[in-house]
Amino acid sequence: MARFPEAEARLLNVKICMHCNARNPVRAVSCRKCGYVHLRPKNKDRKA
């Protein structure tokens, strides 16, 4: 997806809040915007 691995790591190594879809750091326990605790890792591959 990205042109070089550093950019891909910056874009894809995040967690997504299941409540408000905010981007959070990988080591986050709760969402930085809404405080929700259910976070998922961002999908690494496209569905299409």
Curated annotation (Swiss-Prot):
Q: Which domain of life is it from?
A: Archaea
Q: Mind telling me which InterPro entries this protein's record contains? A: Ribosomal_eL40_arc, Ribosomal_eL40_dom, Ribosomal_eL40_sf, Ribosomal_zn-bd
Keyword field: Ribonucleoprotein, Ribosomal protein
Looking at the keywords, is Cytoplasm present? Answer: no
GO CC annotations, alphabetized:
ribonucleoprotein complex; ribosome
Q: Does Ribonucleoprotein appear among the keywords?
A: yes
User: Single GO molecular-function term?
Assistant: structural constituent of ribosome
Question: HAMAP family in the record, alphabetically?
Answer: Ribosomal_eL40
Q: Into which family does the record put it? A: Belongs to the eukaryotic ribosomal protein eL40 family.
Its name, as the record gives it, is Large ribosomal subunit protein eL40
- Species source reads Methanospirillum hungatei JF-1 (strain ATCC 27890 / DSM 864 / NBRC 100397 / JF-1)
